[in-house]
């Protein structure tokens, strides 16, 4: 069982986005999240890196995202871990916190399904079937904000909630992790786009989304200082992601997951640098 989280109700920051806003506003919203999450003392190829997940402690570093279906609405609040960008909960209009990991968030109600794409879609390959766009974002926000306790017993309502969570994961969480995804979504929100423009990610982006840790590790390996007389490690191409060079990896990632790689920063050292640079 998960250790109960701390500080879910005391976010490090809150980022707000109005679903009707422009693609430029969306880009600013996502860039702002990356900027606030990064370890100020750690970059890879000029890309920000998250501080490490602290070992053996319950998650205690959180941020909130508030998504408003209209400028005057109260908005749907998402609770997201600041160390790995995992979506763990959302708050419906009746004040209920719904959690995706049973027993993680104090006082929350388990939504009835987990937050992995296997839980949500049955198969990670189905990510390429998920339609994204302004209408989908609005529908997702409306569905989760309007959720009631009775919905958990309804098959159709549970399916609607699964689809809504998947939409938000791609348009917020994966968009924060990947410049490719945020660029794709920004294109769908472009004011010149047809009013109801939607799109689906392709196979390369699907592989990226499913391989954030692998891609982060591959880029971090190229940062390791080589022994005297040796040249730095070359980037190992990841063909299914369409990423063949370190430069392409840096252009794909929005922020790296911290991964310990041989000869690189340790968890302890990265945390020390994070705290020394004012990280909370």
Curated annotation (Swiss-Prot):
It is an enzyme of class 3 (hydrolase). It is found in: Cytoplasm. PROSITE patterns: SHIGA_RICIN (PS00275). The keyword Transcription regulation does not apply. InterPro entries: Ribosome-inact_prot_sf, Ribosome_inactivat_1/2, Ribosome_inactivat_prot, Ribosome_inactivat_prot_CS, Ribosome_inactivat_prot_sub1, Ribosome_inactivat_prot_sub2. GO terms for biological process: defense response to fungus; killing of cells of another organism; negative regulation of translation. GO terms for molecular function: rRNA N-glycosylase activity; toxin activity. Pfam families: RIP. It comes from the Eukaryota. The active site is at 174. Its EC number is 3.2.2.22. It catalyses: Endohydrolysis of the N-glycosidic bond at one specific adenosine on the 28S rRNA. Keywords: Acetylation, Antimicrobial, Cytoplasm, Fungicide, Hydrolase, Plant defense, Protein synthesis inhibitor, Toxin. Its main location: cytoplasm. Disulfide bonds: none annotated. The modification N-acetylalanine is found at residue 1. One of its GO terms (cellular component) is cytoplasm. Belongs to the ribosome-inactivating protein family. Type 1 RIP subfamily. Three similar RIP 30 isoforms I, II, and III have been described in Barley. Inhibits the elongation phase of protein synthesis. It inactivates fungal ribosomes even more effectively than mammalian ribosomes and is thought to function as a constitutive antifungal agent in plants. PANTHER family: PTHR33453, RRNA N-GLYCOSYLASE (PTHR33453:SF27). This is Protein synthesis inhibitor II. It comes from Hordeum vulgare.
């Amino acid at each position: 069982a998960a250790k109960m989280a701390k500080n879910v109700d005391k976010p490090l920051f809150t980022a707000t986005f109005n679903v009707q806003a422009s693609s430029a506003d969306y880009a600013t919203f996502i860039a702002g999240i990356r900027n606030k999450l990064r370890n100020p003392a750690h970059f890879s190829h000029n890309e920000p890196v998250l501080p490490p997940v602290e070992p053996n402690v319950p998650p205690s570093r959180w941020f909130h995202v508030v998504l408003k279906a209209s400028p005057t609405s109260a908005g749907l609040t998402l609770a997201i871990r600041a160390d790995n960008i995992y979506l763990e909960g959302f708050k419906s209009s009746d004040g209920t916190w719904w959690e995706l990991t049973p027993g993680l968030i104090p006082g929350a109600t388990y939504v009835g399904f987990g937050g992995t794409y296997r839980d949500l879609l049955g198969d990670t390959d189905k990510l390429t079937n998920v339609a994204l766009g302004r209408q989908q974002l609005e529908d997702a926000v409306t569905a989760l904000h309007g959720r009631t306790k009775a919905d958990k017993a309804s098959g159709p309502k549970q399916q609607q909630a699964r689809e809504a969570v998947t939409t938000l994961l791609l348009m917020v969480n994966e968009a924060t992790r990947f410049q490719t995804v945020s660029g794709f979504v920004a294109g769908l929100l472009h004011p010149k786009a047809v009013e109801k423009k939607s799109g689906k990610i392709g196979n390369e982006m699907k592989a990226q989304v499913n391989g954030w840790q692998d891609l982060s590790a591959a880029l971090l390996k190229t940062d390791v200082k080589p022994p005297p007389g040796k040249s730095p490690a070359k980037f190992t191409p990841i063909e299914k992601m369409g990423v063949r060079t370190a430069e392409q990896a840096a252009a794909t990632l929005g922020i790296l997951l911290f991964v310990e790689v041989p000869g690189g920063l340790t968890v302890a050292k990265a945390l020390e640098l994070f705290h020394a640079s004012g990280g909370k």
